[in-house]
Amino acid sequence: MAVKTVQAVINGVTTTLTYNSTSKKYEATITAPATSSYNNNDGHYFPVTIKATDEAGNVTTKNDTDATLGSSLQLRVKEKTAPAITITYPTASALIINNKPAIRWKVTDNDSGVNPDTIGITIDSGSKVTGSAITKTAITGGYDCTYTPTTALADGSHTIKIDAADNDGNAATQKSVTFKIDTVPPTLSVTAPVNGLITNKAACTVTGTTNDITSSPVTVTVKLNSGSAEAVTVGADGSFSKALTLVSGSNTITVVATDSAGKSTTVTRTVTLDTVAPTIKAVTLTPNPVDAGKTYVISVEVTD
């Protein structure tokens, strides 16, 4: 009895095969499913069922569970789209005051899915970190990832690089971000006035220098007593000056230097303005008159 039809059922689609007299086999050219087979089952394949029917209506069926042909009836389809990587912290050119920042990123793949074992981070020229050192939280289509360096990063510029691949072996385009660590506040030297200065001149000029090698430029403010903190111009060499008018009595001058990372240094100077001359209240010469060549005592009472 002759074979009537041979059909293949793959991923819910039935295709009738055509007899090839040359190869003496039933054949068909079929378009593979548009998605990866990785998540279809534990074996990561699409099962294929072959159904052969003869002219008498007898039917033979073979599928992926068949002891002899089962392994031949497993269609594995691999996608070609790589995962997407998004670094969420730190951002490019960020200034960070924490030298052990929690670096965060996301890896997603909407087909075969992200292979968590391929997720890695490299800091500067160090070794790539993978595995359990990275905290991976499952989200739709991938993972939210966090990594905190075990050793504090030095102040200055750093570059992180993130790698990943999907379950079909497609490697994502490496993503990188460069940022700066700044744990040290700016230097601040107030050269004038000296602390504790007593003067009879109301005009007072505050001068000094500031610097921050990691996160320039540095801004400087000067405040007199309870007044407003006023910004002053800082030169390319870090020098600054600010003219003030003192009030009579004790004056507190507060100078604050702040770098681009928000870290600040404060210097305070106390200056006293005294414009009242001392008063000579009494003078006594004892004895008076005094014998020539003898000593006498002069006593002066002065207040200020």
Kindly give the residue locations of the regions a language model identified.
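Extracellular acidic loop/turn motifs
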Residues: M1-K4, D109-P116, N211-V220, D304
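Surface-exposed, short loops/turns at beta-strand junctions within beta-sandwich domains
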Residues: A32-Y45, T150-G156, A243-S250
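Short, surface-exposed loop motifs enriched in S/T, G, D/E and P with embedded aromatic residues
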Residues: G12-T22, A32, T130-K136, A229-A236
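Flexible, low-complexity linkers/stalks enriched in Thr/Pro that connect modular domains
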Residues: D54, D66-T86, S176-P186, R269-P278
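Aromatic sugar-binding surface patches on proteins
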Residues: S21-A34, T137-Y147, A236-S241
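Short, solvent-exposed loop/linker segments at the N-terminal edge
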Residues: S93-N99, N195-A202, N288-K294
